[in-house]
Amino acid sequence: MKAIERILSEFKPDEPILVEDIIRMFPDRSRQWVDNTLSNMTSSKQLIRYSTGVYFIPGTTGRGSSNLNPYKVIEKKYIKDENHVYGYYGDEWLLWKIGIVPRHSDVMMIVSNHEKSRGRKVKVGKVDLYVSKAPTEINKENQWVLQLLEVIRLVDVNELPDMERNQLVNFILDQKITITDVRQYCEYFPDVVSKRILTGYVYDWLHFYLKHSSL
């Protein structure tokens, strides 16, 4: 009973609860105990099972799984929680978030520590995802430089119009990305990333703004 009370007090209604959350809460308990506890709480309607490994405490509306926002599930499962960062949006979704492209693809693209394959399709609620493994371990400290290097991999920054290039410059300055950061993580990306940074017009402006963003 105390375990159930602890779970109910730890999480808010209509917020995703991952089975991994419960495992971390009770490190001395077996996986079978965790599964049985979640099953019992689901049977008694204290929890609702949203999908495999995802639960939530029902709110006052009683509408079942419709109360759980799939984007909250996606964020917690693949991108971040209150204390950790372990993923980011990729491909067109990353370019769109920074302001380099006006729209994104229908399929949400995510790069995450929680995916070990080169890429696979996943569905959360009615949202289609394509999740791929991270080039290196993502955390709070390196999330922004990894996203910058991903952008440089995706597009030739030399060819960006002024407005889109300025959006990227603002991203660099806002996130305080430094030359040291870029040099440290370049090795985890294809050679084309280093070439785009070190040659031509991209080196001139990127080096200037990266240098001054650390001042």
Functional labels for PLM-detected ranges:
Residues 1-2, 142:
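Short helix-coil-helix linker/hinge
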Residues 2-79:
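Short beta-edge/loop segments at beta->alpha junctions of small alpha/beta modules
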Residues 50-54, 82-118:
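Short gly/ser-rich loop at a beta-strand->alpha-helix junction or flexible surface loop bordering the NTP-binding
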Residues 63, 80-84, 138:
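Short, surface-exposed loop/turn motifs that are enriched in glycine and acidic residues
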Residues 75-79, 91-93, 158:
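Positively charged, aromatic-accented nucleic-acid-binding surfaces
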Residues 118-125:
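Short acidic-hydrophobic surface loop/beta-edge motif
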Residues 125-132:
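A short, charged helix-loop
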Residues 133-215:
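Hydrophobic alpha-helical interaction segments
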